[in-house]
């Protein structure tokens, strides 16, 4: 059976929500909310990849593992790859990248993505969910994925494109994309060695580098809602959700 590892990229230099990973939510920092969800999935070891000593200390002080990475990375996937190189992973075939601002991600969805991707030997896979509100189509902080076919429980479809803003009726199969990817190690290595594509730069979405270079991304439907924390409004909504 092939083995997996989870690496969570995280840094302090967020423009929309300063010091985001260290914001306390119900007496726990955002990065530790994400770390604990990853641990609960039980698919493999979990590390935080960061260039900031403050994040490293927070993770370490709470019993977690971290890897220090270069400050100059412009996206999470490059940071994840550097961490994987430093870990010298000899027995790991799959590397999961969970973005450090996805505290709502459900451990069961993490586990299901890992299980189905391994069974079908997918090179790159990710999760999506049905869009819940019409205004989400215009919200650039909620990334949308267009799939080739409709996805339902345990079905998989190829991602055709990703957008930050899109018209609701422009395509048949539009879903909310989650900040999580499972890579075969070989696919991750190929991805980080590709040049940034024009669409990637235009949309500020690193996954478009794969699409633009004919690297297939398979999309699975998540069973539970999740949304990244990018703004103060996102943060307030997450706190309200926890306190219900």
Identify the function of each model-found stretch.
Residues 2-50:
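N-terminal glycine-rich phosphate-binding loop and ensuing alpha1 helix
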Residues 50-51, 105, 183, 230:
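A conserved hydrophobic position in a structured secondary element of the catalytic/binding core
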Residues 172-244:
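Conserved alpha/beta core of the MobA/IspD/sugar-nucleotide pyrophosphorylase nucleotidyltransferase superfamily
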Residues 47, 53-112:
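Short phosphate-binding loop-to-helix
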Residues 106-197:
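Conserved core of the sugar-phosphate nucleotidyltransferase
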Residues 43, 91-92, 119-122, 215:
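Short, high-confidence coil segments that cap the C-terminus of an alpha-helix
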Residues 12, 70-76, 224-226:
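Short, acidic/turn-prone active-site loops that include or flank metal/cofactor-
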């Amino acid at each position: 059976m092939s083995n997996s590892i989870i690496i969570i990229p995280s840094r302090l230099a967020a423009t929309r929500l300063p010091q985001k990973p260290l914001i306390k939510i119900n007496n726990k920092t955002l990065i530790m909310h994400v770390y604990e969800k990853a641990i609960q999935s039980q698919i493999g070891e979990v590390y935080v990849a960061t260039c900031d000593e403050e994040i490293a200390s927070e993770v370490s002080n709470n019993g977690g593992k971290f890897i220090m990475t270069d400050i100059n990375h412009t996206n999470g996937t490059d940071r994840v790859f550097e961490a994987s190189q430093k870990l010298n992973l000899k027995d790991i075939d799959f590397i999961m990248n969970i973005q450090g601002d996805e505290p709502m991600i459900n451990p069961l969805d993490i586990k299901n993505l890992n299980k189905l991707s391994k069974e079908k030997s997918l090179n790159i896979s990710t999760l999506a969910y049905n869009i819940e509100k019409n205004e989400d189509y215009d919200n650039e902080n909620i990334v949308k994925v267009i799939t080739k076919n409709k996805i339902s429980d345990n079905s998989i479809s190829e991602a055709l494109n990703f957008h930050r803003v899109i018209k609701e009726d422009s395509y048949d199969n539009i879903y909310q994309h989650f900040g999580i990817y499972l890579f075969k190690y070989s696919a991750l290595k190929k991805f980080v060695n590709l040049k940034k594509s024009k669409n990637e730069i235009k949309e500020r979405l690193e996954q478009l580098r794969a699409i633009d270079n004919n690297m297939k991304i398979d999309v699975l439907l998540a069973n539970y809602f999740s949304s990244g924390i990018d703004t103060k409004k996102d943060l307030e909504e997450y706190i309200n959700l926890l306190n219900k």
